[in-house]
Amino acid sequence: MVLSSQPPSSRSATGSVLSWPQVLGRLTAGQDLTRGQAAWAMGQVMTGNARPAQIAAFAVAMKMKVPTAAEVSELADVMLSHARKLPTEAICQDIGETVDIAGTGGDGANTVNLSTMAAIVVAAAGVPVVKHGNRASSSLSGGADTLEALGVRIDLGPEQVANSLAEIGIGFCFAPLFQPSYRYASAVRHEIGVPTVFNILGPLTNPAWPRAGLIGCAFGNLAEVMAGVFAARRSSVLVVHGDDGLDELTTTTTSTIWRVQAGTVDKLTFDPVEFGFARAHLDDLLGGDAQTNAAKVRAVLAGAKGPVRDAVVLNAAGAIVAYAGLSSHAEWSPAWDDGLARASAAIDSGAAEQLLARWVRFSQQV
């Protein structure tokens, strides 16, 4: 999909001139925005034309009203129109479709970087991964922090990320580098200190436009909204929310999955016990600073058994299932059996450990 880099129109779908009082007035009255209003507001934010008070008011009012999938789609599309572009056509020609494994953050649980570990395992299983991420949101160490501690350079530009994807099977898009215009909202978001609609935009704005994903959402009431955005894109995505609050597929209890495929959304309850996993305790999955989490990554990839490995295998399998969903012939249970087997084999064979070593070398040499 090609997005225009031009700023959004200053008029609404009805032809009226747009303004902050008009947009904020609808939101504070609990009314959904009309078509184009969310895009206009995000355009103001991304071009530096919105004042911090306007950005904060928009973010909080949108949260209190509860955003619709249409509104969030407009916000994400404007963000993507301002993002640095990856050569997606060349990527698809070389390796086919890709998958993202990411979460909103904000669950406050301070777990290890499960999505980062799962991404490495998925790539080692032969599924191309382009991950979009940032530094810590609510934990001591975000995915970017842990990758740095492992020796992976996170400051690669679009061509370098594309080359990493082609050569190694995995690439990392560091959000501040690929979304420089988002800096206007980022500072305000952190000052607000409570989750808003901005917290769900990261996983929706991967500049490589992967068509598949395992996307975690810490906010149960917004997970279905995210699923609606992916459905409109006709992506194959599992939007997941651990019923313990994690923005991952959890092993401590059940998870809720919004399965997005062929433009439809199905809501499911997923219990890992049915696939042979033991119940874990949240304490088993706790992380630490970047060095501590990097050590846990190395241990899992070296073959260490236990709750962290179980959670990594489960989430890696979920991403493989989402990728399989790009085919209209994919079946749910067989896809899970295949995904779990491939994820386990990627670790046990040493392939995941070797892929990380190659990724570190490649990123340091480009």
Curated annotation (Swiss-Prot):
Pathway(s) annotated for this protein in UniProt: Amino-acid biosynthesis; L-tryptophan biosynthesis; L-tryptophan from chorismate: step 2/5
Cofactor annotation remark: Binds 2 magnesium ions per monomer.
Residues reported to bind anthranilate 2: 189
Reactions it catalyzes: N-(5-phospho-beta-D-ribosyl)anthranilate + diphosphate = 5-phospho-alpha-D-ribose 1-diphosphate + anthranilate
Database matches in SUPFAM superfamilies: Nucleoside phosphorylase/phosphoribosyltransferase catalytic domain, Nucleoside phosphorylase/phosphoribosyltransferase N-terminal domain
Example of a GO MF term: anthranilate phosphoribosyltransferase activity
Superkingdom of the organism of origin: Bacteria
Role played: Catalyzes the transfer of the phosphoribosyl group of 5-phosphorylribose-1-pyrophosphate (PRPP) to anthranilate to yield N-(5'-phosphoribosyl)-anthranilate (PRA).
Xref: PANTHER family: ANTHRANILATE PHOSPHORIBOSYLTRANSFERASE
Protein name: Anthranilate phosphoribosyltransferase
Gene field: trpD
